[in-house]
């Protein structure tokens, strides 16, 4: 991924030393400050100055941004009027606002909330300066927001022919151009500069977004932790300033055919620059010089350019069946190449390089992945698996995308050492479990024995999988400082839940470990934001025998009201509705506990939900209907079991049992 966007910018480091081409700006009709001509600085970046706002203007726009952030308008019409008045004030100042730390947030809010015609007007105001804006810290974010909303409008105009009717802007000018044309004009402007954009810490983000739009891929959210576009620091900062995406983000949009043509044109131009004038196509691979290939390989391990190349390799199949960019990086020969072998080895040992290789083998054709695996990785899979921060991620990708025989070969190498590998890489172990399941529980018995040997070894009196897997003693469990659960605790909990799903032995081991804990400790887990999921995960009525179910229920029933009123415990109480199937005494015991403190339960948001899920109103007023629900539940969960007998647990009737008689139900007095 690219470097996080920070305040103190390091001097731009160019891998190849080539100066990025630039676009001549169009005249900008403003009475305030005319931007200087875009020129290349000493490091190849555009050196554009758009001017600064005076104190009065800055104060006005700061206040406008605060007003939009608070969003206390009485109705939508009032908000529209306010936005229109602010846009009127931004006339001829759009470039200044976009490059300002404070006012760029205002521009984003206007773009997100403005009308379609206002959006087009802002788009037109940036004409001639898109490359310069893309290379600036704050305006690059403005462009990303503008392009996402623009992509949504392109789809609307494409699907609704009447949607692109001309509309009047505030200054009386008609906007006749559809958004598709505005996009194509902008793309023509930045095409000569794409070589510089892929290596630029800010412009690379804009270029990646444009590739996603042109290829009709999902446009990522700017705040999601797994967003494919923004850096980690950028996503955190966006959450802190409370700048939320609208409904246009995290979607895939239909685009016109002209966008696919333009995508080919842009990437073909980039390919020529990277190869010294060679065209796309397999017939031209022989004309690529070794020097060009080495320079592109250097970009693959560059923190900024690497994600761009990953995305290009992902989408190049749309317009190029020969996968020219792939063959610009990797050879197509069936014989080993010393330079390629050294390059692959570097990728497998470098954090950026391993991330690149992990992603590209997930997108490319299976035969290309198989070639790299068989030539450079097959004979040392175990060694690569022990590289926790690099090679192990590539092996995980291989387990997902290789053919069955190759996956089984990898498992044969790794499983005997699984108890050692899991010490430092639980995510890798989850991938091994998934691969085993996908291929018919391959080596399941050996995997289970290896993991039991690690987490629940025989011969130890105090063995407990909760301690060996979750590290309870060193966790945030029971802390009085209201510490948030850590990421490590989440990873360990998810791993244990995966083991529970994988084999019944892990389920039984986990239940035994839970019952071995002091009662207070077990209840603390029920109130923990992460460990409560583990407790909830063992409540699988069809996989747990009655004796263990009763032992667990004896603990839960001691604090059922507080559990019902807790954000995490209430989910556990919901699960107990099914977990008490065939155990009507425990079901009534839980319902009676909630009914006995109904005021507390009903006054809690979570308690009300638990009350509803347990049908407590029927329990209090229509017990016959409530018991009918119990019988229906049992019939659904255990269709082959003996029907529930009044006054006792369901089960097989034993010889010598006395007949039971139905007693009249007690009616609650009004």
UniProtKB/Swiss-Prot annotation:
The keyword Repeat applies. Residues 28-46 have a biased composition (Polar residues). GO terms for molecular function: RNA binding. Keywords: Nucleus, Repeat, Ribosome biogenesis, rRNA processing. Residues 1-46, 637-670 are annotated as: Disordered. GO terms for biological process: endonucleolytic cleavage in 5'-ETS of tricistronic rRNA transcript (SSU-rRNA, 5.8S rRNA, LSU-rRNA); endonucleolytic cleavage in ITS1 to separate SSU-rRNA from 5.8S rRNA and LSU-rRNA from tricistronic rRNA transcript (SSU-rRNA, 5.8S rRNA, LSU-rRNA); endonucleolytic cleavage to generate mature 5'-end of SSU-rRNA from (SSU-rRNA, 5.8S rRNA, LSU-rRNA); ribosomal small subunit export from nucleus. Residues 651-670 have a biased composition (Basic and acidic residues). GO terms for cellular component: 90S preribosome; nucleolus; preribosome, small subunit precursor. Residues 1-14 have a biased composition (Basic residues). It is found in: Nucleus, Nucleolus. SUPFAM superfamilies: ARM repeat (SSF48371). Pumilio repeats lie at residues 89-124, 125-160, 189-225, 289-331, 339-374, 376-412, 517-554, 555-592. Belongs to the NOP9 family. RNA-binding nucleolar protein required for pre-rRNA processing. Involved in production of 18S rRNA and assembly of small ribosomal subunit. This is Nucleolar protein 9. It comes from Lachancea thermotolerans (strain ATCC 56472 / CBS 6340 / NRRL Y-8284). The lineage of its organism: Eukaryota, Fungi, Dikarya, Ascomycota, Saccharomycotina. The gene is NOP9.
């Amino acid at each position: 991924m690219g470097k996080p966007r920070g305040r103190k910018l390091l001097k731009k480091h160019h891998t190849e030393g080539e100066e990025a081409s630039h676009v001549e700006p169009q005249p900008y009709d403003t009475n305030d400050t005319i931007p200087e001509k875009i020129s290349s600085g000493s490091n190849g970046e555009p050196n554009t100055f758009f001017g600064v706002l005076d104190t009065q203007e800055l104060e006005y726009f700061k206040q406008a941004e605060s007003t939009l952030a608070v969003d206390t308008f009485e109705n939508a019409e009032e908000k529209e009027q306010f936005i229109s008045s602010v846009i009127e004030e931004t006339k001829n100042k759009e470039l200044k606002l976009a490059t300002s730390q404070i006012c760029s947030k205002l521009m984003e809010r206007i773009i997100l909330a403005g009308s379609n015609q206002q959006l087009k007007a802002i788009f037109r105001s940036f004409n001639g300066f898109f490359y310069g804006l893309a290379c600036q810290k704050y305006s690059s974010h403005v462009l990303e927001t503008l392009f996402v909303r623009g992509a949504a409008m392109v789809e609307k105009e494409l699907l609704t022919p009447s949607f692109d009717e001309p509309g009047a802007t505030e200054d009386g000018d008609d906007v006749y151009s559809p958004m598709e044309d505005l996009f194509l004009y902008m793309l023509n402007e930045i095409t000569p500069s794409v070589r510089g954009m892929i290596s630029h810490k800010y412009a690379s983000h804009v270029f990646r977004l444009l590739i996603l739009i042109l290829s009709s891929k999902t446009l990522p959210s700017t705040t999601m932790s797994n967003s494919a576009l923004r850096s980690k620091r950028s996503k955190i900062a966006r959450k802190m300033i409370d700048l939320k995406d609208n409904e246009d983000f995290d979607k895939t949009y239909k685009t016109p055919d002209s966008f696919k043509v333009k995508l080919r044109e842009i990437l073909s131009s980039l390919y020529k620059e990277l190869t010294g004038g060679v065209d796309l196509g397999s017939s031209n691979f022989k004309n690529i010089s070794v020097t060009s290939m080495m320079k592109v390989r250097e970009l693959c391990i560059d923190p900024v350019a690497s994600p761009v190349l990953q995305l290009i390799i992902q989408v190049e199949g749309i317009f190029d069946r020969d996968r020219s960019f792939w063959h610009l990086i990797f050879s197509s020969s069936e014989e080993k190449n010393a330079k390629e072998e050294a390059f692959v080895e570097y990728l497998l040992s470098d954090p950026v390089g391993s991330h690149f290789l992990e992603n590209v083998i997930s997108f490319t054709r299976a035969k290309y992945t198989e070639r790299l695996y068989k030539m450079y990785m097959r004979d040392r899979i175990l060694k690569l698996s022990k590289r926790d921060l690099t090679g192990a991620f590539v092996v995980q990708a291989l387990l997902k995308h290789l053919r069955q025989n190759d996956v089984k070969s990898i498992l044969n190498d790794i499983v005997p050492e699984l108890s050692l590998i899991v010490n430092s890489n639980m995510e890798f172990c989850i991938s091994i479990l998934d691969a085993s399941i996908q291929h018919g529980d391959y080596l399941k018995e050996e995997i289970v024995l290896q993991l039991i040997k690690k987490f629940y070894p025989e011969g130890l009196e105090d063995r407990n999988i909760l301690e060996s897997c979750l590290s309870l003693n060193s966790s945030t469990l029971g802390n009085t400082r209201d510490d948030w659960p850590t990421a490590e605790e989440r990873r360990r909990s998810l791993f244990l839940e995966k083991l529970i799903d994988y084999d019944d032995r892990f389920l039984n081991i986990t239940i035994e470990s839970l019952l071995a804990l002091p009662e207070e400790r077990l209840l603390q887990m029920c109130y923990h934001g992460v460990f409560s999921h583990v407790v909830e995960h063992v409540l699988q009525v069809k996989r747990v025998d009655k004796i263990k179910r009763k032992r667990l229920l004896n603990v839960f029933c001691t604090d059922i009201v507080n559990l019902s009123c807790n954000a995490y415990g209430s989910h556990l109480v919901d699960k107990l509705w099914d977990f008490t199937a065939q155990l009507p005494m425990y079901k009534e015991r839980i319902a009676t506990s909630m009914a006995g403190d109904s005021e507390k339960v009903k006054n809690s948001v979570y308690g009300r939900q638990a009350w509803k899920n347990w049908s407590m109103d029927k329990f209090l007023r229509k017990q016959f209907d409530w018991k009918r629900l119990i019988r229906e539940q049992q019939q659904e969960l255990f269709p082959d079991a003996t029907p529930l007998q009044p006054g006792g647990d369901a089960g097989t009737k034993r010889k010598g049992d006395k007949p039971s008689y139905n007693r009249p139900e007690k009616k609650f007095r009004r």
